[in-house]
Structures are given as structure tokens and as C-alpha cells.
Amino acid sequence: MVADLDDAQWFVTACRDVGLVGSVGVMIEVPAAALRAAALAADVDFLSVGTNDLAQYAFATDRAVGPVARLQDPWQPALLDLVACTAVAAGAAGIPCGVCGKTAADPTLACVLVGPGVTSLSMGAGSLPAVRAALATHTGSARRAAAAAARAATSPAEARATARDTLSGQ
């Protein structure tokens, strides 16, 4: 997890100094990193979005605290904006951008994540068939339209519904 460019540069240098060969990337788990993803992408080989922590920091919540746990919904439009910001920056830099965890395992949400440019999704094996089928069913333009519709929503429920409607109407 990095918060800014200095963190990312320190991490890349530390990895190289100990002889790490191969790709070096950073986790985007704080809003500041997502908003500055273009600068971070210039110094790393990939970006990976940790949506659970990103949501926690974006909404100043704890998923274990009942009254505010609802803000941890991965369909929060502001969270989708942060993921899209990161994916677009990675794409512009020519590097991959991944999303891991339960967020990536939702077939409809996977389409919304891939829409703006997420290039890899990490999830439990049991979720792969449904996510694979959803991604194969919908065109790139449909995924982009679903992402735009979800991000324009005013609530997680509306984001989910508009994404589903957009994908089903392709």
C-alpha cells in the first residue's frame, strides 16, 4: 500500500536494491494513491486496487461497525470513480491494473470494472465460471456503457440496477 509517489519510488528502489527481478507494482488502497495514479504508474510495472481498504479509507468507515458498514458496498459510485481513475491512469501508462477480492467476483461488477480499463481480476476459483461468462457475453462497448452508468448513479443500489439494465439492453 502506498499513499504517494515518494512511497512508490521508495518501494521500487528497495525491491531493486535487494535484487528483485520481474514486475514491481503497488497496491492502490488509499484515495490519494488512486487520485495520483498517473504519477504512480510512471514508476511501477502494475497497479493493483484493493477495494476493501480503498472503500474503508474513502468513506472513513469500518466494515465491522454496523451503522456505517453500508458504505463498504463495492457499488458505491465514488469507489467506482476511484477504481476507474486508477485503471485509466494505468492504461495511459501502458501497464496492467488489477482488482482483487470479493469485488472482482461479482459478474456484473466485473463488467463494470473492466469497462474503464481494469485488466485483471483476482478472485476465488468458484467465482471464475460466472465472471468469465459475464465478460464473454458483453462487448467492450457494453461494459464501458455499464461502467459509465454505474458511476453516474447516486447510490449503490442505483449503480447496480443501471449497470444490469445497461448490460441486459446491449
Predicted stretch roles:
Residues 1-170:
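Conserved alpha/beta-domain cores
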